[in-house]
Regions:
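Short carbohydrate-recognition loop motifs
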Residues: 34-50, 348
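Short tryptophan-centered beta-strand motifs in secreted/extracellular beta-sheet-rich domains
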Residues: 64-66, 161-169, 174-176
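Short, solvent-exposed beta-strand-to-loop segments that form ligand-recognition rims
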Residues: 178-196
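Secretory/extracellular carbohydrate-interaction modules
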Residues: 48-138
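Beta-strand/loop-rich accessory regions of lumenal/periplasmic or secreted enzymes
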Residues: 94-99, 103-125, 278-279, 284, ...
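Terminal, non-catalytic domain-edge segments
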Residues: 576-583, 590, 595, 606, ...
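Short, aromatic/His-centered strand-loop micro-motif at the edge of beta-sheets
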Residues: 139-164
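Catalytic cores of eukaryotic secretory-pathway lumenal/extracellular enzymes that build
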Residues: 328, 335, 343-354, 359-361, ...
């Protein structure tokens, strides 16, 4: 028995050694190269280039550790006859296990991370990311860029020294650590998530030992979904991003609560990657009470119900019901012209109603009585002229039983009885004697009840006995939540108007409470308020020089704008609820490009993070302090502050409402992504609703464009894509799957065709002074950048190849311009039919600071993961590298955009890193200064969030 045990032990050892040797192969440029393993140490003799490849593919978050050294071997000499010590190199996450013949340059064809420690005869230590392109003489720029370089002696090879090396590829961040020192900390815009390891050297005697690695899937346990703000329950719809290839049409998903209860879900595709896999997937479900968080998993088969445990669908099969309703506008009934079921799932149904001035969607859910209604008012030419006097949705609610058992309750106030049992004589309801019956016949019955919020800081509650009777009552309050419950002894119905007081003037009125059917009128714009005029604030323009205003004849029109409101019937809760993936997951999947999670390691980190948070708190306070509320205002913020009056310039031309200028929506959204802060969510959501509707045209001559900042949201004559572009709305759409925002993004897909008739540079650079034979003109930024975001969004949402081709044509034609992104004049030739950009002044070079700071920079970051166009991104890198110098040289512009310098530093121009940080930290937007601008706050926050990710280490 002992002899048999010994034999088995020896066989196991031999098997392990054979397996270890079989795990590797040597790819060498010179056949004389050798690799031998003894006592756990592999010795590589490489007269020329050689790679010791590990055959097993690694996947997921990967950590590789080993020890290695270069031996001072007299067989290898320098040109001076000295012993050569060089090239302790490695590849990791390579897309192929070699196969390139051993020659170093041949590996350019692979996608991998490369560290050349002590390369070039032990004079440099360099890190590169290979992208799989073969460089040629014509395209030398395809050669992998040096992303990090050391030349000091401390970071070169010491002969015969065993180095402890650790390689990491975790959540898109790549690190190289040697003897405990991190030499590389690189965020890859296109992370390599699987691949092979290769130990590389040349003209050297190298040794490697104690090789080991671990791979893990951070999403192995599913996607954790958490509440934004307080824990809640009820119907939710949310979006989840996936990396390329992670989920396809055959993927089955399961949703469970934190305590293991299974929840039925509907799911549908929001956006796709170029290979057809899911980029964003939407989910709808009814979350049960007591749920702290949920977990979403991918499965290979349907999940059954555990024995003895009911699924949510078995507990409640009922669907919410939409009460009968009708719509009025300016006290006239607005007929529904079309009704359709837009989506039918096992958990949710979407009903769509369309009319002349409105689009309304109603969402119902199995397992919940809640109905969500999203109503959009569209201002047509008639309403623009007439003005807005009233806008309401009227619901019919059946009433039952005696009047004294009927009631109306507003917010969390005590119920108001239709017939309060208060009389001079005692009422004995149990005895129901003749005195009691007489009292009941003579006690007043109240037929109407009204809650009015005509300002953001005051509401009143009144009631009346019949339609023509006066309203009586003295109930007052400040800010109503816009909730009413109408009920009796049999049933009750509750209504809630989201953002009720913020969207004043609004009101809720109940009529017919004494009859068989009560009418509950939810007035989105209360008829009690003064009529709203869409006219411009003045009859004359005030010029760019005087008031930063660009008013033009006939352009200050509200024809085509919209306003969206949300209403709930029988809401599960009386507060908003949203379930979303964690910031860590969104960050890992690169949702919306490159951004950082909060970093608090160094004093500089604390300074930056505190400043970002203070800017968020500042706008939250300013919204409240200045009362930036109202039906057509809520969600926007002001553009510029007037220190002389100590107030915002609400009455000065282009300095008033902000209208997305310099990416103010993105400022809030990126901070929300990294923090899940419910206060920031509220500001970002409100701004998206406002800017996508009120600042944007949805019909009429300017449909697809938006209005530049002004005293009146639609007052400026500059109607441009930079305001209406899909980029601002992608955040809310992909996180919530909101169909109305989806409609808006679809509306702008072909907005560039308006360039045929509306030239954005018609005044600044008239055609007679800047020759152009193209059918239209635009600027690369912000015009083309805005259109590009529209095309990207339409392509990934619908698969529209026309939009894809326009996007690619624009990218290719920009790289063909003599000066690329700095090609002059500002107004370049453009063909909306093909997407091609041209110039007829090839010798002119010019810079434009608006190009990257109105969403263009963030768009390009996301394009890197969607479009394979290395020439375009190489030209963008050069633009970022040279912008500051060229802006001063060509235009004497000092406009700071430190994220451009940071981008260049991130991609290899390390010397620009200190300049980027100095520019950021020397210009704190809330520091004491003569003026304060939302422009400065937005650009600073976006600079900081990007820089904290890519140039922080």
């Amino acid at each position: 028995m002992n002899r048999l045990t010994c034999i088995l032990f020896l066989l196991t050892i031999l098997s392990l050694k054979a397996t270890a040797k079989a795990d590797w192969w040597l790819e060498a440029e010179d056949p004389a190269s050798t690799a031998t393993t003894n006592d756990g140490v592999t010795t590589i003799i490489a007269p020329k280039g050689a790679t010791w490849w590990y055959k097993h593919k690694m996947s997921g978050n990967t950590i590789i550790e080993y020890e290695a050294r270069i031996v001072a071997d007299p067989r290898f000499k320098t040109d001076k006859g000295e012993t050569r010590v060089s090239d302790l190199n490695c590849f990791w996450m390579a897309d192929k296990c070699g196969g390139c013949g051993g020659k170093f340059a041949n590996n350019y064809a692979l996608k991998l991370y490369y560290m050349g420690y002590g390369g070039n005869w032990n004079t440099t230590t360099r890190f590169r990311r290979y992208k799989g392109y073969w460089p040629t003489e014509e395209k030398e720029w395809l050669r992998p860029v040096i992303l990090r370089e050391y030349t000091d002696k401390a970071h070169l090879i010491k002969a015969d020294h065993w180095y402890s090396i650790r390689l990491e590829a975790i959540d898109g961040r790549v690190r190289y650590i040697i003897d405990g020192e991190c030499l590389v900390d690189y965020v890859d815009p296109q992370p390599l998530t699987s691949g092979y390891f290769g130990f590389r050297t040349t003209l050297a005697h190298a040794e490697i030992r104690n090789f080991r690695y671990t791979c893990s899937d951070p999403d192995n346990d599913g996607v954790r979904l958490e509440w934004i703000g307080n824990k809640s329950h009820g119907p939710v719809t949310f979006g989840v991003p996936y990396a390329v290839g992670e989920a396809d049409k055959q993927t089955i998903f399961s949703l469970t609560t934190n305590d293991g209860r299974q929840i039925d879900t509907d799911t549908w595709r929001l956006a796709s990657w170029a290979d057809g896999s899911a980029k964003w997937q939407a989910f709808s479900a009814v979350i049960p009470q007591g749920t702290d968080y949920c977990v979403l998993r991918k499965t290979d088969k349907k999940i059954g119900t555990k024995k003895g445990r009911q699924s949510i669908r078995e507990e409640n099969e009922e669907w919410g019901e939409i009460p009968p309703f009708y719509l009025t506008l300016n006290n006239k009934v607005m007929p529904v012209e079309k009704q359709e079921t837009e989506r039918q799932g096992k958990v949710s149904r979407l009903h769509k109603y369309s009319g002349r001035n409105c689009v309304m969607r109603a969402y119902t859910y199995k397992g919940s009585k809640e109905v969500k209604i999203v109503h959009t008012l569209i201002v047509d030419s008639s309403l623009n002229t007439e003005g807005l006097r009233e806008l309401s949705i009227h619901f019919k609610v059946p009433m039952h039983g005696e009047a004294y058992k009927r009631y109306v309750a507003f917010d969390d106030r005590r119920s108001m009885s239709v017939q309060p049992l208060i009389a001079r004589r005692k009422i004995d309801m149990q005895a129901m004697d003749s005195v009691t019956r007489s009292m009941l016949d003579n006690i007043a019955q109240w037929d109407g009840f009204r809650l009015s919020q005509l300002s953001p800081n005051g509401h009143s509650i009144r009631k009346r006995t019949y339609p023509d009777a006066p309203w009586i009552g003295t109930i007052e309050g400040q800010r109503s939540e816009g909730v009413v419950t109408v009920g009796d002894s049999v049933a009750s119905t509750t209504f809630r108007m989201k953002d009720f007081w913020q969207s004043y003037p609004s009101s809720i009125q109940v009529d017919g409470a004494r009859g068989d059917t009560a009418i509950v009128t939810l007035s989105l714009y209360s008829p009690e308020a003064e009529p709203y005029s869409f006219a411009h604030y003045d009859s004359i323009p005030h010029t760019l020089e005087a008031a930063y205003e660009d008013v033009q004849p006939g352009m200050s029109t509200a024809w085509g704008i919209a306003r969206t409101s949300t209403i709930y019937v029988n809401p599960e809760t009386t507060t908003d609820r949203q379930l979303l993936p964690t910031p860590e997951y969104l960050h890992r999947k690169r949702a919306f490009g490159i951004w950082s999670l909060p970093v608090l390691v160094s004093p500089r980190d604390s300074l930056v993070e505190n400043a970002i948070q203070e800017i968020m708190s500042f706008y939250d306070r300013e919204i409240e302090r200045n009362g930036w509320y109202g039906f057509f205002n809520y969600g926007d913020v002001m553009h510029g502050y007037d220190a002389s009056r100590d107030e915002w310039r609400y009455d000065v031309g282009g300095y008033a409402w902000d209208n997305t200028e310099l990416a103010s929506p993105a400022m809030f959204w990126y901070q929300f992504l990294r923090t899940a802060d419910p206060v920031v969510w509220r500001m970002a959501e409100a701004m998206t609703r406002h800017c996508s509707e009120v600042d944007t045209y949805h019909e009429g001559p300017h449909a697809g464009l938006g209005s530049r900042h002004n005293v009146i949201h639609w007052g400026c004559g500059a109607k441009e894509s930079r305001i209406s572009e899909a980029w601002w709305n992608r955040f809310y759409y992909y996180l919530t799957a909101d169909e109305r925002v989806g409609d808006i993004m679809h509306e702008v897909a072909n907005a560039d065709t308006l360039l045929y008739i509306l030239d954005p540079m018609r005044l600044a650079q008239p055609r007679n002074l800047y020759p152009c034979s193209a059918p239209a003109r635009l600027r690369i930024g912000p015009d083309w950048m805005g259109y590009a975001s529209n095309w990207l969004t339409e392509w990934e949402r619908t698969g529209n190849i026309v939009c894809r081709d326009k996007l690619q044509a624009g990218m290719t034609s920009i790289t063909s311009l003599p000066f690329g992104f700095t090609q002059g004049p500002l107004a370049l030739g453009y063909d909306p039919a093909t997407g091609v950009i041209t110039t007829e002044m090839p010798e002119m070079e010019i810079t434009n600071h608006l190009m990257p700071i109105m969403g263009g920079f963030e768009l390009v970051n996301e394009l890197q993961g969607a479009i394979n166009n290395p020439a375009f991104f190489h030209m963008w890198l050069n633009y970022c590298r040279d912008y500051k110098e060229k802006a001063w040289l060509l235009r004497k512009s000092k406009f700071r955009i430190p994220r451009l310098q940071a981008y260049a530093a991130w991609h290899g121009y390390e010397k620009l890193r200190p300049a980027a940080w100095k520019s950021l930290l020397d210009n704190m937007p809330l520091a004491p200064k003569p003026s304060l601008w939302t422009n400065d706050c937005a650009t600073w926050v976006l600079d900081a969030i990007f820089m904290q990710e890519v140039v922080n280490k």
